[in-house]
Amino acid sequence: MNVLAKYNQVRSSAQKIRLIANIIRGKKALLALQILSSVKKKAALLVKKLLKSALSNAEHNYGYNKEVLIISKIFVNSGSSMKRMMPRAKGRADRILKRTSHITVILSDIKKNPEGYNGSKSTP
């Protein structure tokens, strides 16, 4: 069974969060938490928060052991953008887009999804 966790309207662009998501995709969930602890980016904190929530959901709601879970899927979609104006010279204004994104993590059991597990690969 797959365990799904979502984090919607995150105040960071999808491009920045995808850098972190690509690092941990396919890894064991507990290993991914250790990796995220060592990355010094705001996006790493956001993904770590979501991953902890997904692990808690798996343990509490479905009775899974945390050691056997892998991140089978993680994807980041663009959310809505807040439009702001920045004053410029001669009475003009430029538009600033404050982007948001939606993060989705799907955890699965190693035994049930062995082809999705690539935790033995080294990260580039």
UniProtKB/Swiss-Prot annotation:
UniProt keywords, alphabetically: Ribonucleoprotein, Ribosomal protein, RNA-binding, rRNA-binding
A family per Pfam: Ribosomal_L22
GO CC annotations on file: cytosolic large ribosomal subunit
Domain of life: Bacteria
Single GO term (MF): structural constituent of ribosome
GO annotation, biological process: translation
Xref: InterPro entries: Ribosomal_uL22 (IPR001063), Ribosomal_uL22_bac/chlpt-type (IPR005727), Ribosomal_uL22_bac/org-type (IPR047867), Ribosomal_uL22_CS (IPR018260), Ribosomal_uL22_sf (IPR036394)
SUPFAM superfamilies assigned: Ribosomal protein L22 (SSF54843)
Keyword Cell membrane assigned: no
Its biological purpose: This protein binds specifically to 23S rRNA; its binding is stimulated by other ribosomal proteins, e.g. L4, L17, and L20. It is important during the early stages of 50S assembly. It makes multiple contacts with different domains of the 23S rRNA in the assembled 50S subunit and ribosome. The globular domain of the protein is located near the polypeptide exit tunnel on the outside of the subunit, while an extended beta-hairpin is found that lines the wall of the exit tunnel in the center of the 70S ribosome.
Subunit structure: Part of the 50S ribosomal subunit.
Family statement: Belongs to the universal ribosomal protein uL22 family.
Identification of the protein by name: Large ribosomal subunit protein uL22
Source organism (scientific name): Buchnera aphidicola subsp. Cinara cedri (strain Cc)
Gene name, Swiss-Prot/TrEMBL: rplV
